A protein has these predicted regions:
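Catalytic-core segments of nucleotide cyclases and related cyclic-nucleotide turnover enzymes
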Residues: 9-36, 56-59, 105, 158, ...
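Catalytic core of bacterial c-di-GMP phosphodiesterases, primarily the EAL and HD-GYP domains
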Residues: 8-10, 14, 18-21, 85-88, ...
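Active-site core of bacterial EAL-family cyclic-dinucleotide phosphodiesterase domains
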Residues: 44-110, 146
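Nucleotide second-messenger and two-component phosphorelay signaling modules
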Residues: 34-35, 64, 68, 80, ...
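Flexible, glycine/charge-rich interdomain/linker segments that couple
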Residues: 7-12, 30-57, 74, 140-147
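Catalytic-site/binding-pocket detector for metal-dependent nucleotidyl cyclases
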Residues: 48, 115-116
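Conserved helix-loop-beta segment at the catalytic/binding core of cyclic-nucleotide signaling proteins
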Residues: 1-3
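Catalytic/regulatory signature loops of cyclic-dinucleotide turnover enzymes
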Residues: 20-45, 60-72, 132
Length: 174
């Protein structure tokens, strides 16, 4: 007799962490009652569920940040040693939370995991371009923006960026 209960094990976003843990424990008991050795002996379900729960919490935080327009581009100057002037800026993503700005690393991972990275990258790029348009009347400042490798080869995404650059009358070289 085969036991297929394991295939239905997944973290449901609508359920509480404790419910998920209880579900796993119940599944393991069913294995034991059926006299089947669990292939999951030694696997730390609590840790896995804690990680998945954290991912969902971060995803919800990221969604709220998008909805509340709290994704902010930061501009890190890149100085020309010869002139001592910043002629380029690297655009970095931050998430505004109260009076603080959160670093993006874990949120970028979450955006990639939940297929939100295209939206997040485009928000950062759009805001950076709009700010550049306001402060750079002569269109001389160059921006360097890091985008996810997951969207780098997506022609629709790249065309959206080109369209935004054209809409703002910014030179493609900058």
């Amino acid at each position: 007799e085969s036991f297929t209960g394991l295939t239905s094990l997944r973290l449901n976003e609508g359920r509480e962490f404790e419910e998920e843990l209880a579900s796993v424990e119940e599944l393991l008991m069913e294995y034991e009652e059926a006299g089947i050795e669990s292939p999951l002996i030694g696997f730390d379900f609590k840790k896995l569920l804690e990680e998945k729960h954290k991912e969902i919490v971060l995803k919800d935080e990221l969604l709220r940040a998008v909805e509340e327009d709290r994704i902010i581009p930061f501009f890190q100057p890149i100085y020309d040693i010869k002139t001592g002037k910043a002629n380029k800026f690297e655009v970095l993503m931050r998430i505004k939370q109260g009076d603080k700005y959160l670093p993006p690393f874990q949120y970028i991972q979450i955006a990639e995991l939940f297929n939100m990275i295209e939206s997040v990258d485009f928000i950062v790029i759009s805001k950076a371009l709009e700010y550049k348009k306001k402060i750079d009347a002569n269109d001389e400042v160059e921006l360097s923006v890091n985008i996810s490798g997951l969207v780098l080869h997506d022609y629709k995404f790249l065309n959206k960026i080109v369209k935004k650059v054209d809409e703002l009358n910014i030179k493609h070289s900058n």
